[in-house]
Amino acid sequence: MIVLALDVYEREKALSIAEDVKDYISMIKVNWPLIIGSGLGVISELKKKTGLPIIADLKLADIPNTNRLIAKKVYDAGADYIILHSFVGRDSVKAVKELGEIIMIVEMSHPGALEFINPLTDKFIDMANEIKPFGVIAPGTRPERIRYIRERLSKDIKVLTPGIGAQGGSPVEALKAGADYIIIGRAIYNAERPREAAKKIFEEVKEWSSR
């Protein structure tokens, strides 16, 4: 249920944290800071170190051919999933899905998203229901929006929610609203003892799910 967002630059730091918390997480999400700072090879290193699936959070948003070229390299490097924007349209999204599993962004939580992305949430949900990605991204800081998206999304499509922890989102509230995976970064990797931080969240989630 817990996805660790490793938004750090340093390879050694990323590998150390990942190994430290692997017992309490389900997947690892790498973003541009780590890929730029350490190279694509860090994806396979993380998989080898932890045995966990890797999400490449590239937020791809280009024409089909460019999306395809980028995605091929990232999947070849060992990524299990790629996150991409929906607003570029079906052709660009499908170009990536032809190569591997995808996670589509249907809504974001930052203020700027209200201008262009969030007004199209319903269209993005319809697109996801048609294309059948592994999952979609929904704002973990807004349980009411998680619930809205979950109710309109095919049951076989997972809901992943960033913004848990440092940004104010509650792990249990996100799960109650319909999230399948909660994405947590700073609350774990910036903690004085990342393993203990991950364990605490894991136990909180486990206690709720066993009720």
Curated annotation (Swiss-Prot):
Chain positions recorded as substrate binding sites: 7, 29, 57-66, 109, 162-172, 185-186
Gene3D superfamilies recorded: Aldolase class I (3.20.20.70)
Keyword Lyase in annotation: yes
Reaction(s) catalysed by this chain's protein: orotidine 5'-phosphate + H(+) = UMP + CO2
Pathway involvement of the protein, from the record: Pyrimidine metabolism; UMP biosynthesis via de novo pathway; UMP from orotate: step 2/2
One annotated GO biological process: 'de novo' UMP biosynthetic process
Domain of life: Archaea
HAMAP family to which the protein is assigned, alphabetical: OMPdecase_type1_A
Entry protein name: Orotidine 5'-phosphate decarboxylase
Organism, as annotated: Pyrococcus furiosus (strain ATCC 43587 / DSM 3638 / JCM 8422 / Vc1)
Upper classification of the organism: Archaea, Methanobacteriati, Methanobacteriota, Thermococci, Thermococcales
Encoding gene per record: pyrF
